[in-house]
A protein has these predicted regions:
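Conserved alpha-helical substructure of the radical SAM core
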Residues: 1-18
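Active-site beta-strand/loop signature of hydrolases that rely on acidic residues for catalysis
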Residues: 21-23
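Conserved AdoMet/S-adenosylmethionine-binding subsite of the radical SAM
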Residues: 25-205
């Protein structure tokens, strides 16, 4: 409940408007909305899985394509290659990565070849986020669900979306340590950018 600081008020706020999942490309009039939003923010950005084309996306809107993995019968098969037009428009690619378990590699254990080829061809950057594993839901969320009711929109914003790396017993620290170290080493080996979920460390929404 902090007051809105001066830098976050009025036109040309010193902040970036980021639109992300679900899948933003499924929303109607998204490009028109981004066009209207330009004067109010320092920059606009959208994160999409790249499966659907975003027509008329403003040129100065940053497009981050974050491909998803195909799953079948609960098994992870492979990363889905985005639509070719989305790859051509993309400013960055972003992937989630986890370390192999018991020497068993999954699609989350490496970046697909086509992404390395895209980076080499376009000279654009690829970001890699270590996967964070959870042991349970945050305590406040669990208490509300135990009462037999769903979270309100306000609660989803103020409670459900606030997750802290420091809440005891919430995250699987051993697996997360392996994932962070593995992703960092992979990035150094291949010249990619390590992208951490900083809001978890600062207990921010």
């Amino acid at each position: 409940n902090l007051p809105t600081p001066a830098w976050a008020q009025g036109l040309a706020k010193k902040m970036v408007l980021v639109i992300t999942g679900g899948e933003p490309s499924l929303q109607r009039n998204l490009s028109a909305f981004l066009e209207k939003a330009q004067p109010y923010f320092q920059q606009t950005q959208i994160e999409s899985n790249g499966s659907s084309i975003l027509p008329d996306l403003p040129e100065n809107t940053t497009l981050v394509v974050s491909p998803k993995c195909l799953e079948k019968d609960g098994a992870i098969i492979r990363y889905l290659k985005p639509n070719i037009k989305m790859l051509e428009r993309a400013d960055y690619l972003k992937f989630v990565m986890s370390a192999p378990e018991d020497n068993h590699y999954t699609p989350y254990s490496e970046i697909p070849t086509w992404a390395h080829e895209w980076a080499e061809k376009t000279k654009k950057q690829v970001f890699v986020s270590p996967m964070n594993r959870y042991l349970r839901e945050p305590q406040r969320v669990q208490k509300i669900r135990d009462k037999g009711r769903d979270l309100t929109l306000e609660e989803r914003s103020e409670i459900n979306e606030v997750v802290s790396f420091w809440e005891p017993g919430l995250l699987d620290l051993k697996k997360n340590q392996r994932n962070h170290e593995y992703a960092a080493e992979y990035c150094m080996k291949h010249g990619l950018i390590l992208n951490l979920q900083i809001h978890l460390f600062a207990s921010l929404p």
